[in-house]
Amino acid sequence: MAHKKGASSTRNGRDSNAQRLGVKRFGGQVVGAGEIIVRQRGTHFHPGVNVGRGGDDTLFALSAGSVEFGVKGGRKVVNIVVPA
């Protein structure tokens, strides 16, 4: 039985596409309602005031305002500060 599989046969050659995760809008930036703030796997950042969380844990703005990152109860949270 051959211990090599023969010519032009390989088990390599796979490379997945990047997932384009990360922070898309940084602290102090102004966003509109529905804009994506963070794309993530799991809840590295938790949604705060005026921020929603999608089924794939994406954080998005629920209302227009400026982005604010902070900590609450030991968790990193993202808030949207609405101008008065």
Curated annotation (Swiss-Prot):
GO terms for biological process: translation. Residues 1-21 are annotated as: Disordered. Keywords: Ribonucleoprotein, Ribosomal protein. Residues 7-19 have a biased composition (Polar residues). The keyword NAD does not apply. It holds the Pfam family Ribosomal_L27. It comes from the Bacteria. The keyword Ribonucleoprotein applies. InterPro entries: Ribosomal_bL27, Ribosomal_bL27_CS. One of its GO terms (molecular function) is structural constituent of ribosome. GO terms for cellular component: cytosolic large ribosomal subunit. Belongs to the bacterial ribosomal protein bL27 family. This is Large ribosomal subunit protein bL27. It comes from Clavibacter sepedonicus (Clavibacter michiganensis subsp. sepedonicus). The lineage of its organism: Bacteria, Bacillati, Actinomycetota, Actinomycetes, Micrococcales. The gene is rpmA.
